[in-house]
A protein has these predicted regions:
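N-terminal secretory signal peptides and thylakoid transit peptides that target proteins
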Residues: 7-27
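N-terminal Rossmann-like dinucleotide-binding module
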Residues: 23-89, 167-170
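Short, solvent-exposed loop/turn and secondary-structure capping segments
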Residues: 60-64, 84-87, 122-126, 146-147, ...
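Conserved SAM-binding strand-loop segment of SAM-dependent methyltransferases
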Residues: 93-97
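Short amphipathic alpha-helix with an adjacent loop that forms part of the alpha/beta core around
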Residues: 100-106
């Protein structure tokens, strides 16, 4: 890379970073986080966005920025998700392997990561190493080690980052934070937190009784045909190899097994 190209790249990152920081302040008006960090009003320039994970939360995040930014890249291991997203963004490049997205890193400014939990850190790390701003769905990582690696990479990249926690970016949550930070309720000495659900081992009858989505039993010993259009190997990514089973996918079932998800706390 020539000196001129380096300066041009640095200038581009600086402009985009300032815009990201500006939109962070605006994000409080949104009830749902989506990539609120990207939604700015009255800003002429548009960001070029790469979306990694286009189904589920990824589809919601894509919809949240599609009207204000340029969607230039779409990636999903499920061709069904990818096809639906691409039908609304026919000019975007499409990939099933997120690693290939960064072969064209010069084409986008920021990345939205909405893959399954066990690959969040890997896609985020690739984005940071390429100097891209990142909005990543919760949880940011799957282990303490991954979190430390991401923290170090973010410090080096000096780009804007945000982790998506949806409603926590809403105006009421931000108002409460401001009240606490200004000392309106005095020193905070204790915090009581509870959740109303837990993904323990359940029989189908127990799951039905508690209105749960799916029962959680011992890991299946058999396999199911891999759905057409799903690249199961890429879906597994860094996780141990497992035969496909319908109990894992589709839907919010996979996160009840540690190699892919983090259980109840990561789903709140």
């Amino acid at each position: 890379m020539t000196h001129t190209q380096q300066l041009s790249q640095a200038k581009s990152q600086s402009i985009s970073r300032r815009r990201f920081l500006k939109t962070t302040a605006i994000a409080g008006a949104s009830t749902f986080a989506a990539p609120a960090i990207l939604r700015a009003k009255g800003v002429i320039e548009k960001l070029n966005i790469a979306v990694i994970g286009a189904g589920g939360r990824g589809g919601a995040n894509l919809g949240a920025v599609a009207g204000t930014e340029n969607i230039v890249t779409l990636c999903d291991v499920n061709e069904g998700n990818l096809g639906r997203a691409a039908s609304n963004h026919p000019k975007a490049r499409t990939f099933v392997d997120y690693r290939k997205v960064f072969d064209h890193a010069n084409e986008f400014d920021a990345v939205i990561v909405s893959t399954c939990e066990h690959t969040h850190a890997f896609a985020t790390l690739a984005a940071l190493q390429n100097g891209k701003h990142v909005y990543c769905e919760k949880p940011l990582t799957h282990s303490i080690w991954e979190a430390r690696v991401i923290r170090e990479a973010a410090a080096k990249a000096k780009v804007a980052t945000q982790m998506g926690i949806q409603i926590h970016s809403g105006s009421n949550y931000r108002r409460v934070v401001e009240l606490i930070q200004t000392g309106a309720i005095g020193p905070v000495r204790e915090a009581h937190v509870w959740v109303s659900r837990a993904w323990g081992w359940q029989s189908p009858d127990d799951a039905k009784k508690h209105g749960d989505i799916v029962s959680t039993q011992e890991r299946p010993t058999d396999s199911s045909p891999i759905p057409k259009g799903l690249d199961w190997d890429l879906w597994l990514g860094p996780a141990p190899e497992r035969p496909f089973n319908n109990v894992y996918f589709p839907g919010p079932k996979w996160y009840r097994w540690w190699e892919w998800g983090s259980g109840t706390m990561s789903d709140l």
